[in-house]
Swiss-Prot record:
The active site is at 224 (acyl-ester intermediate), 356 (charge relay system), 464 (charge relay system). It comes from Diutina rugosa (Yeast). CDD domains: Esterase_lipase (cd00312). The lineage of its organism: Eukaryota, Fungi, Dikarya, Ascomycota, Saccharomycotina. Disulfide bonds join 75-112, 283-292. The gene is LIP1. GO terms for biological process: lipid catabolic process. Glycans are attached at residues 329, 366. It catalyses: a triacylglycerol + H2O = a diacylglycerol + a fatty acid + H(+). Transmembrane segments: none annotated. This is Lipase 1.
Amino acid sequence: MELALALSLIASVAAAPTATLANGDTITGLNAIINEAFLGIPFAEPPVGNLRFKDPVPYSGSLDGQKFTSYGPSCMQQNPEGTYEENLPKAALDLVMQSKVFEAVSPSSEDCLTINVVRPPGTKAGANLPVMLWIFGGGFEVGGTSTFPPAQMITKSIAMGKPIIHVSVNYRVSSWGFLAGDEIKAEGSANAGLKDQRLGMQWVADNIAAFGGDPTKVTIFGESAGSMSVMCHILWNDGDNTYKGKPLFRAGIMQSGAMVPSDAVDGIYGNEIFDLLASNAGCGSASDKLACLRGVSSDTLEDATNNTPGFLAYSSLRLSYLPRPDGVNITDDMYALVREGKYANIPVIIGDQNDEGTFFGTSSLNVTTDAQAREYFKQSFVHASDAEIDTLMTAYPGDITQGSPFDTGILNALTPQFKRISAVLGDLGFTLARRYFLNHYTGGTKYSFLSKQLSGLPVLGTFHSNDIVFQDYLLGSGSLIYNNAFIAFATDLDPNTAGLLVKWPEYTSSSQSGNNLMMINALGLYTGKDNFRTAGYDALFSNPPSFFV
């Protein structure tokens, strides 16, 4: 009798999990013992042929009886340019490679719009677990869901007594997902990659209950481009995040990324990149360039895309492909939307790494003098006046002891201008943009963090995306934030229920009297003030559009 019972228990544990979707289709997943996974589920029609560059169309085929046990291919990737390997010591390079954010993901395909659901073992419909929906990063040029398996986070949530369901969604990147220009705006196809993410959220709203998730307890979170994507969804439709009369998400977590400092979709640079892509693909003289681009082979479009500037090119964060105001879903520049209160009213966590710009600074090592730095900034920020560039140069001086990686004195100056440029890129794209958001956002409880965990790492310091390493491998004090606190926030809307030894203060403004940041270093957690580099903040954000790209 005991043997029969034991065999029955083993069989039940090993049985493949199933879920019945809203349309009645029953699908089978993978029992991975430490979790159950449904991987590579289509949520949209393949965006190929006439659907290339267009809004995603909900998947209409039958999935009944199918098995979903492996990740689908990533969406097509743009190979990043750059020679950073030549300029970094091994210790820094090893961590960069572990972060997996700066490299193309293979295999890739245009037929890529799939979603993944991973849950604790034994979870059934009706469990009503909180849901964490992950949006991967990669500069809006690379990335895929297969790069960030959530096994560690699921296991940690179980150990905390706060089990969660993890969802990740593939979305189109680079030219396939974020092509801009007059033709794209006229057709209404701007920001297709964001629309992929949004459709994935709608799929979750319709189906996650079948997997044991609670559609009213969804937290969207992401890193880098994923973090900026979370911000875009907070601002989407002037903050209307409802679907079928209910919110798609109730909270947001942003790791290294806030408002995208981007011109409109029909702005000068978006049109320049559209024309360059068309020319590269042999469509430059076509009467309908967009139709021509839809007609070229996947390989031709990939080659054409790879010959437009990537995020490791000299132009760096002046990205070829990124979310842009379209007048429809992103109705204005994102800084204006935040100032005007046009956002979803939800609690948020938003934070950064201390040296967000160093990795990107390796792309401009030929800039070595003050005059060259000034010209670099003028080329990067074409809307800024001479006076604004002068103010920027004063706020971020050539003194290498004040540059990034910060607090390293005369060390880590690859060139006389490397630390200056790294400081500007990091503050504009990430660290001080976060402060701008927090100073203007009143939609819900706010928490913020800043990590200095790798302050001793040569050249890069606590560089952009290093948090992924600590998040995936449960290492160091950073993991207490990126796993424990995030899980607690998704469950209770309060990171302090994670039982951290240091209480995480709420953020009211950068000038509040008490501490407002959770700080992370190699020794542990502590609190601090968000009051550094005020001259840089004023230079960059007194008139944000001056530094749009």
